Amino acid sequence: QGEGGIRSFSLEILKLIRGLCDDTGTLLIVDEIQCGLGRSGKLFAHEWFNINPDIMTIAKGIGGGFPLGACLSTKNASIGMVKGKHGSTYGGNPLACAVGCEVMNNVLEDGFLENVEMMSRYFSQKMLGLLSEFPSVFEELRGYGLMLGLKTKIENISFTNEAFNQNLLLAPASDNVVRILPPLNITKQEVDYVVKLLRKTAQRLEN
């Protein structure tokens, strides 16, 4: 969950849900709008758990900032979607689809997802250091890949506001979590700079 505070499912829970869906003939719908398209370090986050959904929603990253979304499904799940059953006034916009194709070309380039994983490990290591350095400010690090969350002991809005004053744009989420969603092509030097700004923010707010 992104809005819920970067809450990750466990492998056991996901396998249980997949099994329940199989046993009852229920479709498993996976929302990859925030965590998909490489943000987790794999093309789709569910790949980390070897779980295959029946329906999957994707958006945000697929458009690279351009409004675009898609719904993917297995053949069995889409059997009722015959011609005329689904449509939208501006669906299939040629410009949006061209942008999406170019985004996919970049994400699928050799080394792109590997770099996301590498930067994720580096970023997480640096932020765990911040947790140790500022125990009165930070409580927990959450997330996968470059979809990370810092649970704060102070009000998360106070943290994001002070970060904004330091020219760092962060997003608050539920459970008093600050979301950190850097671009997937972030460099090691840029990670260091973000951590520097996080440290300055924490210094301003620590008790």
Positions of PLM-derived features:
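Conserved N-terminal phosphate-binding loop of PLP-dependent enzymes in the Aspartate aminotransferase
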Residues: 1-207
